[in-house]
């Protein structure tokens, strides 16, 4: 009977460690989700700033006249 009791105790110990690991991983996922949400907010703000910028007075490469050949 002691063998069965030892196995039960071993399983209970393993379960306790697994529950702790699951909780630690859950906290890490929560932290990463907050970080992703913050980064998404920053990206949306940058997109808005880029869209609000005045177009540049410089010509694009397609509009630029080719350099003279020497």
Swiss-Prot record:
Coiled coil: none annotated. InterPro entries: SlyX. It holds the Pfam family SlyX. Belongs to the SlyX family. This is Protein SlyX homolog. The gene is slyX.
């Amino acid at each position: 009977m002691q063998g069965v009791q030892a196995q039960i105790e071993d399983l209970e110990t393993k379960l306790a460690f697994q529950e702790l690991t699951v909780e630690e991983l859950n906290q890490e996922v929560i932290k990463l989700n907050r970080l992703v949400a913050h980064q998404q907010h920053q990206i949306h703000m940058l997109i808005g700033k880029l869209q609000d910028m005045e177009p540049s007075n410089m010509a694009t490469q397609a509009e630029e006249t080719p350099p003279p050949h020497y």
